[in-house]
């Protein structure tokens, strides 16, 4: 599972018992790892149907003993621009691959900050500028579909908007360099063309890498992540005292 996670929870510093929001949880990949680590996780998304699958997986994990006893995992459906949580409710917020979908991204960022405790930590991940720009150049379908990507962030723009919302960037990491060529191939042949042999072959390579984690691909990805990493993750903190902005 760790191979497909964009967030490094060791670097984020997740500890058992912390209340963590997965904002825009989607299919739940980060929420499941948070649950395994003993966090009190809330998977939040606008897609109630997808959250049903997440809730089913939470129940299966509990049944199989994959999460520490006494840990809670819940799902909540709603709007990221107006989340149904009290102020300063969460110790941490994870927002992975959500902001690029939202026309009102800055409003969502302010909501993230509102529900995060002072001194709390957050991580926001988005597609990296260069790999994403290549995808947009190769295919309109990639980003123009309903619910698709509405912008490409530069790292300075993303950190600037998050800073304006009240967060302090601490460090950043790029991830998934080996995934970028796959998406370039998909965009070149058509994102909806699932039968083309080139993307199929590359996808088999990615699955093999995920299952086997050989040193050669781990080394290659570590080398290439800063250059063509498909995603960039910005790790941030919320000051314990609000910092007035000029």
Where are these regions (language model features)?
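Alpha/beta-hydrolase-fold catalytic nucleophile elbow
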Residues: 125-127, 175
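A short hydrophobic/small-residue beta-strand
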Residues: 41, 122-123
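A short glycine-rich, Lys/Arg-flanked "PGG" loop and its adjoining helix->strand segment in the class I
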Residues: 106-121
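A SAM-dependent methyltransferase catalytic signature shared across enzymes that methylate proteins
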Residues: 156-173
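Short, glycine-/aromatic-enriched active-site segment of Class I SAM-dependent methyltransferases
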Residues: 127-151, 159-160
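Conserved catalytic loop of SAM-dependent methyltransferase domains
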Residues: 171-210, 229-231
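Conserved N-terminal segment of class I S-adenosyl-L-methionine
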Residues: 1-86, 92-96, 106-109, 200-210, ...
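A short His-aromatic
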Residues: 97-101
């Amino acid at each position: 599972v760790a191979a497909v996670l964009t967030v490094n929870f060791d670097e984020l510093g997740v500890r058992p018992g912390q209340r963590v929001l997965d904002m825009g949880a989607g299919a739940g990949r980060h929420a499941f790892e948070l649950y395994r680590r003993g966090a009190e996780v809330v998977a939040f998304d606008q897609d109630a149907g997808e959250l049903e699958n997440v809730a089913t997986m939470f129940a299966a994990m509990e049944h199989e003993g994959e999460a520490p006893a006494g840990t809670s995992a819940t799902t909540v459906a709603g709007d990221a621009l107006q989340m149904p949580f009290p102020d300063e409710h969460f110790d941490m917020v994870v927002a992975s691959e959500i902001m690029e979908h939202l026309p009102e991204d800055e409003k969502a960022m302010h909501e993230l900050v509102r529900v995060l405790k002072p001194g709390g930590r957050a991580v926001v991940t988005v597609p990296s500028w260069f790999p994403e720009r290549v995808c947009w150049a190769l295919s309109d379908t990639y980003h123009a579909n309903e619910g698709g990507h509405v912008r490409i962030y530069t790292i300075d723009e993303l950190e600037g908007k998050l800073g304006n919302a009240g967060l302090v960037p601490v460090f950043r990491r790029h991830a998934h360099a080996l995934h970028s060529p796959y998406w370039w191939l998909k965009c070149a042949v058509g994102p909806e063309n699932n039968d083309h042999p080139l993307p199929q072959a590359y996808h088999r390579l990615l699955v093999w890498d995920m299952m086997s984690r050989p040193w050669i691909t781990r080394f290659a990805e570590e080398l290439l992540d800063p250059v063509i990493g498909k995603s960039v993750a910005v790790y941030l903190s919320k000051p314990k005292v609000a910092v007035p902005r000029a």
